[in-house]
Amino acid sequence: MAGRKENPVLTACQAPSGRITRAQAAANRGRFGFAPSVSLPARTERKQTAKGKTKRGALDEITSASTATSAPQPKRRTVLKDVTNIGCANSSKNCTTTSKLQQKSKPTQRVKQIPSKKQCAKKVPKLPPPAVAGTSFVIDSKSSEETQKVELLAKAEEPTNLFENEGLLSLQNIERNRDSNCHEAFFEARNAMDKHELADSKPGDSSGLGFIDIDNDNGNPQMCASYASEIYTNLMASELIRRPRSNYMEALQRDITKGMRGILIDWLVEVSEEYKLVPDTLYLTINLIDRFLSQHYIERQKLQLLGITSMLIASKYEEICAPRVEEFCFITDNTYTKAEVLKMEGLVLNDMGFHLSVPTTKTFLRRFLRAAQASRNVPSITLGYLANYLAELTLIDYSFLKFLPSVVAASAVFLARWTLDQSDIPWNHTLEHYTSYKSSDIQICVCALRELQHNTSNCPLNAIREKYRQQKFECVANLTSPELGQSLFS
């Protein structure tokens, strides 16, 4: 009986294992006077509360620590500031250590780490240091490969020698030596002539040296008075270098003749008048034609194409507003297309080596006319028109290729002075000084030019004659010259 009485008490004092309802709690309160407490849920709740407080405290600590740090960047971007630790075996340890060091150190300091393996340093390319403190570089394998490719391309594109072809270098050396030899020979002859003029100078001359100084106009900057003599000295040396062959019709050409060349040039004179081109364009056009024919065989069907292409090139070089390619095609009645003209243009330019600046007869005629007009014995304007007319007559005649442009210009001035005034010798010390020729040096050319001047009936090519028969040129084409005596060349 005693055991039976103690069991209910023990059972009642024990903590219930299940959930306590309101009825059970009221019964226990009435029986024992208190409600039994549940210890296990309370301990669990306290543990959860303690754990929750621990986690929140850790987060608050990290947040406060990150707020106090001056660098707002995440840890990983700060670690990659030093690129030498990429791909290392101890990267995780190094990251933690480096982040702590960078937070404590100044922003301008850099933490260098030594990689644990040698392969790490080999894979990472060298990068320049960051320009701003606190910046970082993120490099992967693709960027490393691209950097290596760029370095290889840069090495491959490094310039080598300017002349890799030894043959090209030798040709240029030959041409340079030929040019220098021509210049040296000409300058030696010019110096000898100057010494001779100084020895034969007369005290009554205006300059005291036997000739009139035509370069004393220092007020006109376009005349280049201070170095005009040096300019024309170099031009006379340059005309010896790039000049056409005087026998290319006999030596090279088989399908064209001298007459075809004359017809082409006569037609080009009309074209230049139609488009109002300057005389320098016409002279350069014919120079390009003769230089090209001196090197290349051409068929007669392509001769007119060469003519308009040469005038196109000369127009681009001399004119302010050059005619278009379509206009040159139009004047040939569209015999040649634009593509054919452009193709021929490239062929001519490459054959000339793009050397278009050559002294022509017109170049020297300006200088020699200025020297001839210094005496003022003949009208200056008429003398200029007549000398230009005689010089242009030589463009059509193939036989005048054997004379230098300066010789033709000097001969035109000689014959023009003789045609307008027979009372005086047409050659004097001033012309001899500025042309570098004596009257005996140009005798053959002057005689050939006079025959060309009088040959009006047998020549069907009258474009130049009709041009200078106009009133604006004072009809100088109608003038003739008397016989040339031998005394004029002594």
UniProtKB/Swiss-Prot annotation:
Listed A to Z, the keywords are: Cell cycle, Cell division, Cyclin
Tell me the superkingdom of the source. Eukaryota
Q: Which family does it belong to?
A: Belongs to the cyclin family. Cyclin AB subfamily.
What terms describe the molecular function in GO for this protein?
cyclin-dependent protein serine/threonine kinase regulator activity
Q: Which organism is it from?
A: Oryza sativa subsp. japonica (Rice)
Per the record, GO CC terms? cyclin-dependent protein kinase holoenzyme complex; cytoplasm; nucleus
Protein name per Swiss-Prot or TrEMBL: Cyclin-A2-1
- Phylogenetic lineage: Eukaryota, Viridiplantae, Streptophyta, Embryophyta, Tracheophyta
Pfam short name (any one): Cyclin_C
Positions of region (Disordered) = 34-76
Q: Which InterPro entries match?
A: Cyclin (IPR039361), Cyclin-like_dom (IPR013763), Cyclin-like_sf (IPR036915), Cyclin_A/B-like (IPR046965), Cyclin_C-dom (IPR004367), Cyclin_N (IPR006671), Cyclins_cyclin-box (IPR048258)
Which GO terms are recorded in the biological process aspect for this UniProt protein?
cell division; G1/S transition of mitotic cell cycle
Comp. bias intervals (Polar residues)? 63-72
